[in-house]
Regions:
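Contiguous, non-catalytic segments that form substrate-binding/exosite surfaces or channel walls
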Residues: 103-254
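All-alpha helical catalytic cores of prenyl diphosphate-utilizing isoprenoid enzymes
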Residues: 173, 177-180, 205-209, 215-229, ...
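Secondary-structure capping and boundary motifs in well-ordered enzyme cores
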Residues: 41, 102, 129-132, 172, ...
Length: 494
């Protein structure tokens, strides 16, 4: 058989993809539908699945096939797939099975307890579980770093964002720090000159859900291959054929759930448009977490908070919640572009959002590199929040260092993806505007087809065929350039 070793690999990775499919849906269920009493058994079942996948991927035959397939006559896509297979294999073989299982169990325990500990502001209880997750994550980072010859944190960063390093992040975030605080202060000062009319609730959850579904429909979500549910923290999971997104509702606050849905719809459209011809293979997966976040932030911020989109969305708001003063066109746009530093990352405006990310990046990097301990987190969080946003989180763990789900299961290295994603989104939107004259008028008229076609051609259809750098350069003519993000914030808010 032609390319026999490569064919063996595709069959193996197809199996892995199917197990991953089941794990993903079981995890979604754990976060949305599972009764509390099911937590321990579900955690054990998911850990067993992690071990099974690890065993398949680390079989020595896989290593032999990879070496032999490198000599076979493969086309461009097959070569890209082999590169991604090799990366997955190398990442898996660095970890002993016992660590994979222990980390999965500790993560499930920590996340499940966090759901009740966060509302109770119980840092003491949470930190005990987090210490175990950090211990195991440090062990994983140490093993990966020894093999890669890098810092422990960079070894975890590479899982989410291949080829990114903390040295490069420090340059990008250093640039951000040189102008963002001043820009933020100017915007806050400018907006203090005008009055805003806040939307008056209550906004019934069922009606909010209807509005969210309407927004998903506008944005091209395929309901035949996906659904919307409720969870403690908004997320997107599942598989390209069956994408699950969630949001959370507050009957006194309309826009948090709505823009949570719009954000997750960006993730979902990317997943739903990944290359089906390569389904089940690593090359068909999303390129990286930053590219994934670029799509959600493209939808939520570049498109969703634009004047043109907000004008188009407003009739759907009027149809469900009437035409109170807050929902005049001028006020609705102003309210959705309001910049107000706050405690919660997922509710942050796009000017102050990077501050939340840089703060978390600096803390998690120091934590994984062994420069600080879990007990140091609350004081550092408070110090950095005061420096960036002038807000104190002292003793307010719920709205400070306990607010995110990411660290509960050892997702250290993920947070930078949000701000990298915002930078990529600004650069992509700038290129789309150049390529599509009359784009703003089309958006105001509710016609997003040309924009989505552009994303499909330039990002979605390529999966992991190209490196992040190649993908962005092909789409925009240059590698990541922070200038577009700065120009976007300046033109929208000043």
């Amino acid at each position: 058989m032609k390319n026999n070793n490569y064919q063996q690999l595709t069959r193996t990775f197809q199996r892995l993809s199917r197990f991953s499919h089941l794990s993903s849906i079981a995890s979604w269920d754990m976060f949305t539908m599972m009764p509390p009493g099911g937590s321990a058994a579900r955690g054990e079942a998911l850990a067993e699945m992690s071990v099974l996948q690890h065993q398949i991927l680390t079989d020595k035959k896989v290593g032999e096939w990879l070496a032999a397939a490198a000599e076979e006559d493969l086309n461009d896509v097959e070569q890209a797939n082999l590169r991604e297979m090799t990366r997955h294999y190398q990442q898996a073989t660095l970890l002993p099975e016992s660590l994979v299982e222990a980390k999965s169990l500790a993560g499930s325990r920590c996340e499940h307890a966090w759901r009740t500990q966060r509302p109770a502001n119980d840092w003491q209880g949470f930190s005990a579980n987090l210490k175990e997750v950090v211990k195991l994550s440090r062990e994983e980072a140490r093993l990966r770093a020894e093999a890669k010859g890098c810092t422990p944190y960079d070894a975890l960063l590479d899982i989410f964002e291949p080829d990114m390093t903390s040295a490069r992040l420090d340059v990008l975030f250093g640039d951000l720090k040189s102008w963002l605080p001043e820009l933020l202060a100017k915007v806050v000062e400018k907006q203090a000159q005008r009055s805003f009319v806040p939307p008056q609730g209550p906004f019934p959850t069922a009606t909010q859900r209807e509005l969210g579904l309407e927004a998903m429909k506008m944005l091209g979500f395929d309901f035949n291959g996906g659904r919307l549910d409720v969870s403690a923290h908004p997320f997107c999971s599942g598989v390209p054929e069956d994408v699950r997104i969630t949001t959370r509702y507050d009957e006194n606050e309309l826009l948090s759930a709505l823009f949570g849905v719009i954000h997750e719809t960006g993730h979902a459209r990317y997943e739903q448009n990944l290359p089906r011809a390569w389904a089940g293979q690593p090359v068909a997966l999303a390129r990286s977490t930053a590219i994934h976040e670029s799509q959600s932030l493209f939808f939520e911020m570049q498109l969703g908070r634009s004047d043109a989109f907000l004008k188009h969305l407003l009739p759907a708001v009027h149809a469900r919640f009437g035409s109170q003063a807050a929902f005049s066109e001028e006020n609705f746009i102003a309210w959705n572009q309001r910049v107000k530093p706050g405690y919660i990352r997922v509710d942050a405006d796009e000017v102050s959002y990077p501050a939340h990310v840089v703060l978390r990046y600096e803390i998690e990097r120091a934590l994984i590199n062994g420069e600080i301990e879990v007990d140091d987190i609350p004081a550092l969080w408070d110090e950095k929040m005061q420096a960036w946003l002038g807000l104190s989180t002292k003793d307010n763990y719920r709205n400070g260092c306990m607010q995110d789900i990411h660290w509960t299961d050892g997702g250290f290295g993920y947070f930078p993806s949000y701000t990298l994603g915002a930078m990529y989104a600004a650069q992509l939107f700038d290129s789309a505007k150049t390529a599509l004259p009359g784009l703003q008028a089309s958006i105001a008229g509710g016609d997003f087809s040309a924009l989505f076609d552009w994303l499909r051609q330039n990002i979605w259809q390529h999966g992991s065929r190209f490196s992040t750098s190649q993908l962005i350069t092909q789409a925009t003519g240059e590698d990541l350039n922070i200038r577009y993000f700065r120009e976007h914030l300046t033109s929208r808010y000043l």
